[in-house]
Amino acid sequence: MAKFDAHLKCSFCGKSQDQVRKLIAGPGVYICDECIDLCNEILDEELLDNQANTNNSPQVKKKLPTDNPKKSVPLELTSIPKPLEIKSFLDNQVVGQESAKKILSVAVYNHYKRLAWKFKEENKNSNSKDSQATKLQKSNILLIGPTGSGKTLLAQTLAEFLDVPFAVADATTLTEAGYVGEDVENILLRLLQKSEMNVELAQKGIIYIDEIDKIARKSENPSITRDVSGEGVQQALLKMLEGTIANVPPQGGRKHPYHDCIQIDTSQILFICGGAFIGLEDIVQKRMGKHSIGFTTNSDQNKVDTKKIVDPRDALKNLELDDLVKYGLIPEFIGRIPVCAVLDRLTKETLESILTQPRDALVKQFKTLLSMDNVELSFEPDSVEAIANEAYKRKTGARALRSIIEELMLDIMYTLPSEENVKEFTITKKMVDNLFSSKIVKLPSGSKRVIKESA
C-alpha cells in the first residue's frame, strides 16, 4: 500500500504528493492545492469580467430600468387605492372572509401610505428642519386559517390589484445559515426575479411566506439541541421582517465570501405570513376553560364557558399572543407581525359560491375550456350543491373543488372534442352522485373481521 501511495500525483500538473502540500482525491483523479488556487484565480477574474461587461452593456440597462421605477407603484398619496376600493376588488375574487379582507385592506393601505410619506420626505427641501421628523413603522401581516380557506389567494389578489412584484416562499424549505437547505435571503431573490432584477421595484413589493406554522418551535421550552428548521429560521427572519439591508446572492443558494451579493432594503417590503396552525384552537380552548376547573367554580359560569369554547372557529376569535407563543412562535417573531387576521372555515354555502361567483370561478373556467370545442357547458343548481357537499366532506377547503370537478369532467373532456354533433352539455346532480357513490364499497351484512391471536 505504501508503494502505491508513493506514485500518487496531481492529474492536472503532474506533481507528486511529495512536491505539494495537499493532494485531494476524486473518483480516479487527483488535484493538488496549487491547481485549486489557480482555478480560483481564473474563476474570480472571469466573474469580474462578466460583471464589467454587464454594467457596460446597453441591452442590460434597457432591460433593468432601475432609474425609472414602475409607474403603477403608488408613490403619491392621491394614487393609493382606498381601503373600500381594495376590499371591493378582493370581493370579486375571494368569497367570504369579510373580517380578513377588511384587515388586509386597511393594513395594505397604511403600508403604502407609509411609502408615500417616505417618498415625500425624501424629496423635501433639504433646508426643512421637519424632514424625516416622523418615522412610520412597518406592519407585517399574519394570516391564520385552515387549508384551502384562501390565504394565498388573498395575497395574490392584493398584488394583482396594486400591480407590484409579488413572490411566494415556502417556509418549510428554509433552514438556519450553515445547514443544508435554503437561506432566508433566497426569499428576496424570488422577489428580485419577479421584478426583473430591479432592486428599486423589488423594495416596494409583497412577499407571502406560506406554511409559517411549520417553523414553530418543537416544544414550548427552549431545547438544548439546535432547532435549525424551526426556531433557528425564526431568528434568521427577525431582521428581514423588521427591516434591514440584506445581502442576496444573485445566483441563489448559499452566500459565498468571494461572490458579490445584491443589497436590498427590506424596510419597504410588505411581508404576509400564512399558516394553518393546526392545533391552535385546542390551545385557545384550554386557556379559556382554565378558570372553570376546580371545586369552587360556579356551575352556571361553567355552562356559559363551555358554550363559548365548543366551536373551534369561535375559539380563534379570542386568540392572544400567549397562544401563539405556546404553539411555538418566539415572542420576538410575533412582535414583528403586529397585524393578525383569522380566516373562517369554509361552509357548504361558501363552497357553492366559490364555484360560481368569483371572476375566475371553476365553473366559468370549464365553460371557457369547452367553448373552445364549440360546446356550451352548463351546471344544474343541484349539481353545484352536490359538488360543494362532497368538497366539504374532504375537509381540504376550496382545493377539493378542483379535484372533484376534474374527476367529474375527465370522461366528458375525453369524448366531447370528437363528437361534432354535440353543442350543449349539462352537468346534473345524478352524474355527481353516481361518480362518488360508486367508490363506496359496503361489506356483506354477515361479514366479521377475525383477529388471530399470536401464540
UniProtKB/Swiss-Prot annotation:
CDD domains: RecA-like_ClpX (cd19497). PROSITE patterns: CLPX_ZB (PS51902). It holds the Pfam family AAA_2. Residues 52-75 are annotated as: Disordered. One of its GO terms (biological process) is proteolysis involved in protein catabolic process. The keyword Zinc applies. This is ATP-dependent Clp protease ATP-binding subunit ClpX. InterPro entries: AAA+_ATPase (IPR003593), ATP-dep_Clp_protease_ClpX (IPR050052), ATPase_AAA_core (IPR003959), Clp_ATPase_C (IPR019489), Clp_protease_ATP-bd_su_ClpX (IPR004487), ClpX_bact (IPR046425), P-loop_NTPase (IPR027417), Znf_CppX_C4 (IPR010603). Zn(2+) binds at residues 10, 13, 32, 35. Component of the ClpX-ClpP complex. Forms a hexameric ring that, in the presence of ATP, binds to fourteen ClpP subunits assembled into a disk-like structure with a central cavity, resembling the structure of eukaryotic proteasomes. One of its GO terms (cellular component) is HslUV protease complex.
